[in-house]
């Protein structure tokens, strides 16, 4: 069983549930753990999700998964918030979290304003402009990272 088929089917079942509750799908994971699988669903909303949101999505999705029987193997369903180190995947995420500390990793070496090459950028999100994510680095200079050069990005918790 390929991991992409169940993910697509789960997302199709999940999206109407989330839409009805005013929630956003942040990420879906489906991976083999021992002899069974783990289906992990990360959800969010502007003012954050709570335990009741997670429980309701879990109940609703469980019913749909049982009815549709789209995962043939044994699995465990987990529904949670994306946490403090929330992944940033969509352009809207970078806009929504302007001013927040984030880590952006790129697919290749890029230069910041001072010409220093790097693949990891730690700084404060300043938005998106002309297909580039703008980030004010903790050490001062700004970097503009082309959208297609972003390998991975997530919020970073500030102590």
UniProtKB/Swiss-Prot annotation:
One of its GO terms (cellular component) is cytosol. Pfam families: DUF150_C, RimP_N. It is found in: Cytoplasm. Its main location: cytoplasm. GO terms for biological process: ribosomal small subunit assembly; translation. InterPro entries: Ribosome_maturation_RimP, RimP_C, RimP_C_sf, RimP_N, RimP_N_sf. Keywords: Cytoplasm, Ribosome biogenesis. Required for maturation of 30S ribosomal subunits. Belongs to the RimP family. HAMAP family: RimP. PANTHER family: RIBOSOME MATURATION FACTOR RIMP. This is Ribosome maturation factor RimP. It comes from Trichlorobacter lovleyi (strain ATCC BAA-1151 / DSM 17278 / SZ) (Geobacter lovleyi).
